[in-house]
């Protein structure tokens, strides 16, 4: 199975980057995981709500242009569905059984556009609280790792 994570914006904090590198390494035995990091679209000074919407829409277009052909799209969204870690591991079991590849999408500082959120197959919430986009990347990777450990009956999840 291939897993793509498309995200907008760089990680600036070393403590998050090293966590991301660690979980990418731990995930290597379970499939091809690759991260597509896109540059943030510049937010104009004193941006109005419509300027911000334009930024999110442009980022949404760039995201969709970078999703690998045929991948099942899951957007990370605080208002999406919430799953237990066991239920999240079922997402990978089902994808494996049906031969699907998955693409997780993380927005930039302004979030994802309504158009993008309408175009994806699923929306996943990690919590009703809002995280920074780098933190979301790290938490998602840890949960993907946890899901594979659960799926394979390997120790980690308690
Ligand atoms: C700083 S947040 C954007 C906040 C923005 N106000 C919004 O409504 O999406 C950046 C990105 O991180 C992801 N994110 C943040 N918190 C999340 C959560 N609790 N669950 C899922 N994704 C989250 C989303 O993909 C979001 O677009």
UniProtKB/Swiss-Prot annotation:
It is found in: Cytoplasm. Its EC number is 2.1.1.177. GO terms for cellular component: cytoplasm. S-adenosyl-L-methionine binds at residues 76, 107, 126-131. Its main location: cytoplasm. The keyword rRNA processing applies. It catalyses: pseudouridine(1915) in 23S rRNA + S-adenosyl-L-methionine = N(3)-methylpseudouridine(1915) in 23S rRNA + S-adenosyl-L-homocysteine + H(+). The keyword S-adenosyl-L-methionine applies. Keywords: Cytoplasm, Methyltransferase, rRNA processing, S-adenosyl-L-methionine, Transferase. InterPro entries: Alpha/beta_knot_MTases, RlmH-like, tRNA_m1G_MTases_N. Pfam families: SPOUT_MTase. GO terms for molecular function: rRNA (pseudouridine-N3-)-methyltransferase activity. Specifically methylates the pseudouridine at position 1915 (m3Psi1915) in 23S rRNA. PANTHER family: METHYLTRANSFERASE, RIBOSOMAL RNA LARGE SUBUNIT METHYLTRANSFERASE H. Belongs to the RNA methyltransferase RlmH family. NCBIfam families: PRK00103.1-3. This is Putative ribosomal RNA large subunit methyltransferase H. It comes from Methanocorpusculum labreanum (strain ATCC 43576 / DSM 4855 / Z). The gene is rlmH.
